[in-house]
Amino acid sequence: MRGLFTSAGLCALAALGLAWPTCASAQVDDVLGPQAFDGTIDLRASVAGGETSWLDGGFGKLRYGGNAGDSEAHAQVASADIAWKPQFSFALSGLVSVTHQAGQSTGVDLNEAFLSYRSGPAPTRFSARAGVLWPPISEEHAGSTWQVTDTITPSAVNSWVGEEVKVLAFEGKVEHRFADQTLALTGAVFKHDDMAGTLLTYRGWALHDVRMTVWGHFPLPQLSASVSPYQAPITNPFWERDGRAGYYARIDWQTPGPVSVNLFRYDNRGDRVSTYQMQTPWRTRFWNAGAMAALGARTVAKAQVLWGNTLVGPDTPYGIPADVDFAAAYLLLSRELGGGKVTARGDWFKVHDNSFVASDNNNEHGWATTLAYKHPLTHFADAIVELLHVESNRPARVTLGAIAAEQNQTQLQTSLRLGF
């Protein structure tokens, strides 16, 4: 953990150094007034069937699951978030957000904390972020507390981004606006994402809205006899163990029409062998392609495709201990209806295990469908109803969980999302 405090401390000192000259001239209300704070409380009720949720140590794909084949009902404060977003000047601002999530391993934990810079209005603009942040991947999250915008549960793609792809980064972006279109390039170097790939390999894909935190950890399902002597039963996604910096890059194109597309590349450059407390850095690389289009005045389409590879362990004559290719995609349609918004989404996901399948089979494939309706009750409250069904095949369920490889789950949720 020393690496976390050292890196975070250096980042905080750098941020304060940049912000200090402008703090004195900033309006107090812009830094400490009501407009400098945001908050969200999510009151949740749900009914779910099928296998035990992965959050409770099973192989279930959803936030909630059944119990011994029976459906279970839940009512809880699913999350409570507070964000401080000081505006030091036109060019310089910040964001610090903390969260409490039901079942979170730490009571209250850090969500994001970064300093932002933007240049003045011009055809070519520059911006930068430095601190703890999610890379610009998800088309489904927005806001100072990184909330899902159209549904309760994000896609498999962005569920994974939320649980394993948070970083401590220095990010820069250049954007040029032409007469009828915009082109932007983003690049960053980062640390503190050495464990990305652990959940994806040993649990597989999932669909849920639980986000990783700086000091938190997630449980893993039952591990095989060949893996359990070397892998802890938990994973700490934000750990930094190998001292290596990774990178990511993105290109965005806002076309002349109501369509935007982007392409993203990520490589954490993990060394695969520097084990600490039975957790080893993974070498995880992936691409993400995204698109968004307005289909008339009231309908929006979103899509993402993510594919890559993750590795852990030394080279052996028989391959690398964990070597999996992964891919997932979704298509989402959202339309304004009856004063609210109805959203339908289809998901597909797959994991292909390239090594030691006889002793540790991490193959998986599946699909999911989601239907949600979001209705504003007041300026500060939204009601959301969501029905989600997922079917998946994972052979490890038979050998490690004593259940059938093919499983399906259905989850009905209602959310009262309060903002302040």
Where are the language model's segments positioned?
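Positively charged n-region of N-terminal signal peptides that target proteins for export
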Residues: M1-L4
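Bacterial N-terminal signal peptides
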Residues: A8-W20
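Outer-membrane beta-barrel biogenesis signature
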Residues: W20-S71, D193-S224, P237, A381
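Outer membrane beta-barrel
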Residues: P34-F37, D42-G50, G69-W205, D252-P256, ...
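Extracytoplasmic loops and strand-loop junctions of Gram-negative outer membrane beta-barrel proteins
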Residues: L62-N67, S97-V98, T151-A156, P229-N236, ...
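Short sequence motifs at beta-strands and strand-loop junctions characteristic
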Residues: G69-V77, S105-D109, S159-K166, W239-G243, ...
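Outer-membrane beta-barrel pore domains
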Residues: F114-Y117, H141, P258-F420
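Signature for the C-terminal beta-barrel architecture of outer-membrane proteins
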Residues: R118-A128, E163-L331
